[in-house]
């Protein structure tokens, strides 16, 4: 079988089909949404999750390009293939702009649509210009108009927490969107995508009938790649990757799941893989970090500081009601909506009696990428050496040589300059938490948890489970005694693996960082 051509970086459905590149069939969702009640639809998904390709697929469908859908699910579902005029607005380039720049940008993208339909206008107000365009296209073609808006929130993301700038840009965008309400009779379908959810009142003040399908089960798999799609549409890709990695098909599927799976956008929900990472993985023939490398989480780190959200908090399950994470980011009072809507945490469960959702990191790619990005903020110029230390520690941990592993860690800690920080203990608690969490990059299962003045950690390798208690300014003996007294290791008696108990203590002696340990 000829090797698939993967559409890395290609977001145009027509090009993918004409160039015979691989396409995960999402057309059943297209048919479902276009044949249900409602005219206005909104979908929120993290970046690099296939939103732009979905919008492009809608465009080809509404333009009646039946030949592009040959062999896809919708070919058997759709009987009419009526062609409609489509206005496609991509707002992804409308970032980092002042009010005047944004206004010019909106006029420019309207002009491009005017040129497509040979409609001339010299109006300078974006709302009047768009209103005229919808009316002119409807009259000219004799059909209702389809409006597709990709990344509706792009102009607002940078200023979501700068009230004065946000108000200015939000008013501009509200003005731009206002004709969508007044021309309802001329519109066949309106679809908008974005990353974050801005309050409906602030952006679409008059558009009160948008159907938000972001957390609806019928559309849970509309973006991303579900496990079923992976196993049925990419089966040969799995086999080829397994051959490259010199491991079994089953081992490869498990590795793909641990690295790229784990997303859920409602509950219950199918397992959803990150499409960008999965396609890059198959194209390269190796499992690596892809999605995280496409965006710098500086903004996220700043927000973590603002809301006093620690790295250790990311490792815990967050229990919240729907309104506390599926909420407008510009009015958020915690960091949870930003974490969820950006794809750093996802739904992992739901408790029906309390109506509380469990949110957590989706997979290893996010865990390692996020903690790897946080490490330089705690170790500054020592982060590269820390990564080397973690890599070398992983080899020793897998061998079961814990004395050597902790000697290596202690040698590194001694090189980090002492800083008379008012929260020195808290700083190092988070630093060590991150370093242990990053061992997951080397096939070591790490579950660290924090409490006041200590960290408890379990590490699992192929043949052993290590139960560790890390204290600060106490003693390793005291840490080990706590493991014994509280029977922490009992939970792993039936694992069939050797269970090793380790007490750790971090302290500062003569302004030098020191780690001591005792293995029970």
Predicted feature residues:
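Mg2+/Mn2+-dependent nuclease catalytic core
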Residues: 167-171, 472-489
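Conserved catalytic cores of phosphodiester-cleaving nucleases, focusing on short active-site segments
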Residues: 432, 455-472, 486
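Active-site metal-binding core of divalent-cation-utilizing nuclease and nuclease-like domains
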Residues: 137-141, 435-462, 507
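Phosphate-binding site recognition
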Residues: 1-424, 440
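Domain-level recognition of nuclease-like catalytic cores that cleave nucleotide substrates
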Residues: 491, 495-520
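Metal-dependent nuclease catalytic cores in nucleic-acid-processing enzymes
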Residues: 176-183, 337-345, 433-437, 482-502
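Structural motif
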Residues: 146, 464-466, 500
């Amino acid at each position: 079988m000829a090797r698939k051509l993967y559409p890395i970086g290609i977001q145009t459905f027509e090009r993918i089909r004409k160039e015979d590149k691989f396409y995960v069939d999402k057309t059943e969702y297209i048919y479902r949404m276009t044949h249900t009640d409602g005219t206005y639809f909104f979908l929120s998904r993290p970046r690099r999750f296939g939103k732009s390709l979905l919008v492009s697929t809608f465009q080809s469908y509404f333009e009646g390009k039946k030949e592009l859908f040959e062999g896809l699910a919708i070919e058997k579902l759709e009987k009419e293939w009526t062609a409609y005029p489509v206005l496609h607005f991509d707002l992804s380039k409308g970032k980092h702009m002042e009010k005047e720049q944004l206004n010019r940008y909106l006029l420019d993208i309207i002009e491009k649509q005017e040129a497509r339909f040979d409609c001339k206008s010299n109006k300078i107000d974006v709302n009047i210009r768009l209103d005229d365009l919808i009316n002119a296209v409807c009259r000219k073609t004799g059909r209702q108009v389809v409006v597709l808006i990709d990344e509706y929130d792009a102009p607002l993301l940078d200023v979501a927490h700068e009230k004065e700038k946000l108000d200015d840009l939000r008013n501009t965008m509200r003005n731009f969107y206002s004709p969508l309400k007044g021309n309802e009779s001329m519109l066949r379908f309106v679809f908008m995508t974005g990353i974050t959810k801005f309050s409906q009142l602030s952006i679409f003040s008059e558009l009160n009938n948008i159907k938000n399908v972001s957390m609806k089960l019928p559309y849970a798999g509309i973006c991303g790649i579900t496990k079923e799609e992976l196993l049925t549409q990419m089966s040969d890709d799995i086999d080829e990757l397994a051959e490259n990695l010199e491991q079994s098909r089953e081992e490869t599927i498990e590795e793909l799941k641990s690295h790229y799976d784990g997303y859920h956008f409602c509950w219950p929900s199918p397992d959803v893989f990150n499409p960008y990472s999965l396609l890059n993985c198959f194209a390269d023939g190796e499992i690596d970090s892809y999605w995280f490398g496409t965006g710098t989480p500086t903004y996220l780190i700043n927000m973590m500081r603002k809301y006093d959200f620690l790295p250790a908090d990311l490792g815990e399950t967050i229990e919240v009601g729907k309104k506390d994470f599926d909420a407008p980011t510009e009015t958020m009072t915690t960091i949870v909506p930003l974490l969820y809507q950006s794809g750093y945490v996802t739904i992992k469960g739901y408790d029906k009696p309390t109506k509380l959702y469990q949110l957590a990191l989706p997979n290893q790619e996010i865990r390692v990428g996020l903690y790897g990005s946080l490490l330089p903020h705690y170790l500054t110029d020592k982060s590269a050496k820390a990564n080397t230390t973690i890599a070398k520690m992983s080899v020793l941990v897998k061998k079961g040589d814990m004395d050597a592993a902790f000697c290596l860690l202690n040698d590194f800690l001694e090189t980090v300059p002492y800083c008379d920080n008012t929260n020195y203990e808290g700083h190092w608690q988070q630093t060590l938490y991150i370093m242990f969490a990053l061992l997951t990059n080397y096939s070591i299962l790490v579950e660290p948890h924090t409490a006041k003045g200590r960290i408890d950690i379990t590490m699992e390798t192929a043949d052993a489970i290590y139960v560790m208690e890390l204290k600060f300014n106490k003693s390793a003996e005291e840490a080990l005694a706590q493991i014994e007294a509280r029977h922490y290791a009992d939970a792993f008696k039936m694992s069939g693996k050797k269970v090793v108990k380790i007490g750790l203590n971090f302290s500062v002696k003569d302004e030098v960082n020191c780690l001591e340990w005792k293995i029970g």
